Amino acid sequence: MKLPIYLDYSATTPVDPRVAQKMADCLLVDGNFGNPASRSHVFGWKAEEAVENGRRQVAELINADPREIVWTSGATESDNLALKGVAHFYQTKGKHIITSKIEHKAVLDTARQLEREGFEVTYLEPGEDGIVTPAMVEAVLRDDTILVSLMHVNNEVGSINDIAAIGELTRSRGVLFHVDAAQSAGKVEIDLQKLKVDLMSFSAHKVYGPKGIGALYVSRKPRVRLEAIIHGGGHERGMRSGTLPTHQIVGMGEAFAIAKQEMVAENARIKALSDRFFKQVSNLEELYVNGSQTARVPHNLNLSFNYVEGESLLMSLKDIAVSSGSACTSASLEPSYVLRALGRNDELAHSSIRFSFGRFTTEEEVDYAAQKVCEAVNKLRELSPLWDMYKDGVDISKIEWAAH
């Protein structure tokens, strides 16, 4: 076993060696390096063929038409294109958008920007299991609502929204539905022939593909119109200009093709690893699982260790790569906005760690990590006066702290 151990697969995944090989074949002078938009010679034709093959591979994982896949630089850009593209195109129809308080910052910050432009956004409060229900959405739908944007799987707590039921609701009301599927692609089955979803964001680097490439599914039936946010040579049917990076696209396509073949077996293996880890740490007192106990992906285990400061715990686990909150916001010492929205108090939100398991995680690594977590939590609690008070039966929430 090699140290340090990587248990932060929800932040990013390493590129699968099979993917890296396919990408390398598109870089050098002997490889497929041409510009896919070059129509006048074989180098361009071969590159375009590789791009279209990648488009087909992405479409096959989610059962969509390849023509519904638009290449972007990642899920952040896909989210921006979906929200701004819909808002700007359909603003004469209405200016109301619905999302939730626990979305990724790529959706929340885009929604804030649209508010500055005069759109009205309703931010739903999920249940404490991290799930937004169809009833919650229905309660705030209005005649001028043009878009509902919700994630499929939450990046911090791994809970799964029932996007099938929410899609039925939005479609029946004539409201567009955007789903951020960055954390669900390759983990949860997605069938866009059945789901009533109009737009869906994807990222390659959460699925063992390269960083810097993603896609946006844009439905053709019913047809969804978008106003572009990046202008130029009119690539991607005018929705997203810019020379297509053949090697990145080939990488994303191969990563999604592997996910399609191996998802079922991989999910079972990762569930076994996650259960094995949880079983070993579950003897710790005052341990809380964040998010849904049932509707969740096995890859993500977000735990709060009461009376332990999360940052201290992270520092104590120096050979184990885990995170508190999402990678995009984990540099701040603020407690996770997601856990706060789920109703966790500051103390529990501050004591949370996200463990995420993946394709290259081994049983040996899981056992080592569980042992180190137990040792660190017990040691930090020994040093904590709050833990002593809790063990003595003092209700800490009732204490009036006096300022010196």
Curated annotation (Swiss-Prot):
Subcellular location: Cytoplasm
Keyword Iron-sulfur attributed: yes
Pfam family, one: Aminotran_5
Active site positions, chain numbering: C328 (cysteine persulfide intermediate)
Keywords noted in UniProt: 2Fe-2S, Cytoplasm, Iron, Iron-sulfur, Metal-binding, Pyridoxal phosphate, Transferase
Similarity annotation: Belongs to the class-V pyridoxal-phosphate-dependent aminotransferase family. NifS/IscS subfamily.
Name under which the protein is recorded: Cysteine desulfurase IscS
Natural source organism: Pseudomonas putida (strain ATCC 47054 / DSM 6125 / CFBP 8728 / NCIMB 11950 / KT2440)
Lineage, top ranks: Bacteria, Pseudomonadati, Pseudomonadota, Gammaproteobacteria, Pseudomonadales
